[in-house]
Swiss-Prot record:
It comes from the Eukaryota. GO terms for biological process: ribosome biogenesis; RNA processing. This is Probable RNA 3'-terminal phosphate cyclase-like protein. Keywords: Nucleus, Ribosome biogenesis. It comes from Arabidopsis thaliana.
Length: 375
């Protein structure tokens, strides 16, 4: 019988649930935003619990009346085909994709799930970044490429969403350990601009501005357009850009953002601070510059993917993984703490003063998918 882990506070909520499920460790979390004006779990957190109930069997979720206390007993990860889930509109689909990817790998059956909601927002990684970068990082750990896919069937920006994606994830027996420390040189940049319920002129402006930043540095730059209309454009107007640099050693570094064009008077409940919208050219320049900053930081992944990289290393076979990253992000540091707490895996961390990067080594926990159906 595994003892229930007792925790406090709302931090790392998504990761705690993910690691609790993968390690079959029941958890109780107290004092969830107990002192805030609106206490308890947020809509997207309750929604994530519902999603876990869809992809697992026999999970037990117990939330008190105020939402400030949660008991979670994880079930068996089953996966399954033709699943559908409507995500909360308080976070984008990107919030749900990272845990789903990892859970899907260790399921009883391959996972095929349709997620509905917001596909692109400034807070979470966009669905474009998942396609261009996240999936490529996961393939590095021995996951077969042919069964790992994310299709964007409709776009949806805040506040009303209306987007739809189809995620398919294969089952694996175990993740391979990696020795991944060479960043290589950037050989090409690929990107996507999109627009929904607004003129495609926004896309032209972003592409032109972003290319202007890269053209002096690299000849191989292609930014594709994805203008959506009708049902495929979701329920709110907006536009955005996602960029990914690929290096000579197969690293992918990404940056993206989204601008929602919904007028303040059309939405009663948006508590986001309203600010003057900058021109689309500025958005293109901003994301291109951000991508260059991420490349300059060094490391085999960008700062938004450090946490995922460490999770993959910690979940892999009982062999040594060695990776290089830029300056550790706060989320990455928190991830290392959660990994130690749930999986008992400790990373040796060694700064490399010559490059300003950090090299991390760990022995994987050797998580094996025992429930996988052998074909």
């Amino acid at each position: 019988m595994v003892m229930m882990k007792k925790m406090k506070g709302s931090q790392s909520f998504r990761q705690r649930l993910l690691l609790s499920t993968l390690s079959s460790t029941p958890i109780s979390i107290d004092e969830i935003r107990a002192d805030e004006t609106i206490p308890g779990l947020r809509p997207h957190e309750v929604n994530l619990l519902r999603l876990l109930e869809i992809v697992t069997d026999d999970a037990v979720v117990d939330i008190n009346e105020t939402g400030t206390r949660l008991k979670y007993k994880p079930g068996t990860i089953v996966g399954g085909k033709n699943l559908v889930h409507s995500c909360s509109l308080s976070r984008s689909i990107g919030y749900y994709l990272e845990p789903l990817l990892l859970l899907g790998l260790f399921g009883k059956k391959p996972l095929s799930i349709r997620l509905k909601g917001i596909t692109n927002d400034p807070r979470d990684a966009s669905v474009d970044t998942f396609r261009s970068t996240t999936l490529n990082i996961i393939k590095r750990f021995g996951v077969p490429a042919e069964d790992l896919e994310l299709k964007i069937e409709a776009r949806g920006v805040a506040p009303n969403g209306g987007g739809e994606v189809l995620l398919t994830v294969p089952n694996i027996k175990t993740l391979s350990a990696v020795h991944w420390v060479e960043e290589g040189m950037v050989k090409k940049i690929r990107g996507t601009t999109f627009s929904t319920r607004v003129t495609s002129d926004f896309e032209h402006s972003m592409r032109f501005a972003a290319r202007g930043i890269f053209n002096n540095l690299l000849p191989d730059v292609h930014i594709f357009q994805d203008h959506r209309a009708g049902a495929q454009a979701g329920k709110s107007p907006g536009y955005g850009i996602s960029l990914a640099a690929e290096t000579t050693t197969g690293c992918f570094i990404s940056a993206d953002t989204t601008v929602s064009c919904e007028r303040p008077d059309e939405t009663g409940e948006l508590d986001v601070e309203k600010k003057e919208r900058s021109p689309a050219e500025d958005t293109g320049v901003e994301v291109a510059s951000w991508l260059l900053q991420e490349i300059e930081k060094g490391g085999v992944v960008d700062s938004t993917h450090q946490g995922l990289l460490f999770l993959l290393c910690a979940l892999s076979e009982q062999d040594v993984s060695k990776v290089r990253v830029g300056t550790l992000s706060p989320y990455a540091v928190e991830t290392l703490r959660n990994i130690k707490e749930f999986l008992g895996v400790k990373f040796a961390i060694k700064p490399d003063p010559l490059t300003g990067t950090v090299i991390l080594k760990c022995t994987g926990s050797g998580l094996i998918n025992l429930s996988r159906k052998l074909s």
